């Protein structure tokens, strides 16, 4: 089933083919060149290529690996069984160290599972390496951070145009291989809307391509989240309007919405209450990694802002 997803079908197999900032790519290439990948924490936003980079490095050195999604299988029993069974045996391929990629490791329980993982990293250090990916490195306990080299997936503004064009070439090649007709300008708009979330770009293009082609009609479904509309509703304390806004916009990444609200605080909120608004946003941003219902969490966040923050 995964092969039907473009993000899997066209996932790069080596670091050279990954769309990454120059300095970051150089760092990862050094690990491959030395055939020695240390315990790593790859930190950055969703869809920027952390898991792809981890797989590509391991593929290039010819090592065996196991991928575990911590948000789905990250309970302590998984560590005690699956990880232990894999990490404690020698690779049958005779390529030396094996690796465990722990995707979305910031979802692991910091009181129980993360300390247990620290113990396994030490116990099996001779024949197994660990690569942890996360969106928020602050959610990983210091004991894990100190046992790993930390690699930040950060794109500077000066690098954005070059990376965007590089990915545009990649996307056009994929669309041509899939025999999908497309409007280049529309593809570029989609790319810049979700930059640097490459996974989101491909998923949106694949989803819309089912209609036969990528054209201007796609943009109707991808209108920017109207933060100004939300800010006005918060200012007027229109709870029903705020709730409707959430329902219509929560298909976007919740963390991206919170970031957009933060970016617009200074234009809409009285300076004296901005610090309090920031604390509220930070609290609910943290909670968003654990809640079962993002709509309720977002509404609780905005209700608190509406009632406790003074608007201009």
Where are these regions (language model features)?
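C-terminal helical "lid" of AAA+/P-loop NTPase domains
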Residues: 188-211, 244-247, 262
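P-loop/Walker A NTP-binding region and its immediately flanking N-terminal helices
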Residues: 1-158, 189, 206, 281, ...
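Conserved beta/loop motifs at nucleotide-recognition and modification sites
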Residues: 64, 158, 175-176, 216, ...
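Helix-rich C-terminal "collar"/helical-bundle subdomain used as an assembly and partner-interaction module
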Residues: 230-312
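Conserved small helical "lid"/interfacial subdomain of P-loop NTPases
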Residues: 148, 155-186
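Short conserved motifs of the RecA-like P-loop NTPase core
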Residues: 168, 181-193, 222-226
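The conserved phosphate-sensing helix
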Residues: 183-184, 193-206, 239-240, 254-256, ...
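Conserved C-terminal helix/linker of AAA+ ATPases
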Residues: 202-232, 277-278
């Amino acid at each position: 089933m995964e092969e039907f997803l473009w993000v899997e079908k066209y996932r790069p197999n080596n670091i050279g083919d990954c769309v990454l900032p120059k300095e970051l790519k150089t760092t990862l290439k050094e690990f491959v060149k030395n055939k020695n990948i240390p315990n790593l924490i790859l930190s950055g936003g969703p869809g920027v290529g952390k898991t792809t980079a981890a797989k590509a490095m391991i593929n290039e050195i010819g090592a065996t690996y196991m991928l575990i999604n911590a948000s789905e299988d990250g309970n302590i029993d998984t560590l005690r069984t699956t990880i232990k069974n894999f990490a404690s045996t020698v690779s049958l391929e005779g390529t030396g160290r094996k690796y465990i990629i722990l995707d979305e490791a910031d979802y692991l329980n910091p009181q129980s599972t993360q300390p247990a993982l620290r113990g396994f990293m030490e116990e099996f250090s001779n024949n197994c390496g660990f690569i942890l990916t996360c969106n928020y490195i602050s959610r990983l306990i210091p004991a894990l951070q100190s046992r790993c080299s930390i690699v930040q997936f950060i794109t500077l503004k000066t690098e954005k145009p070059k990376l965007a064009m590089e990915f545009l070439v990649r996307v056009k090649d994929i669309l041509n291989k899939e025999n999908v007709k497309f409007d280049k300008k529309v593809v570029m708009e989609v790319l810049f809307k979700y930059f640097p979330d490459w996974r989101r770009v491909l998923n949106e293009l694949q989803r819309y391509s089912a209609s036969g082609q990528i054209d201007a009609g796609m943009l109707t479904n991808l209108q920017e989240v109207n933060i100004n509309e939300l800010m006005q509703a918060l200012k007027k304390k229109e709870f029903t309007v705020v709730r409707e806004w959430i329902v219509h916009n929560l298909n976007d990444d919740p963390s991206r919405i919170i970031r957009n609200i933060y970016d617009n605080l200074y234009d809409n909120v009285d300076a004296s209450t901005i610090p309090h608004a920031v604390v509220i946003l930070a609290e609910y941003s943290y909670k968003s990694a654990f809640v079962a219902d993002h709509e309720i969490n977002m509404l609780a966040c905005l209700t608190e802002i509406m009632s406790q923050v003074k608007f201009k």
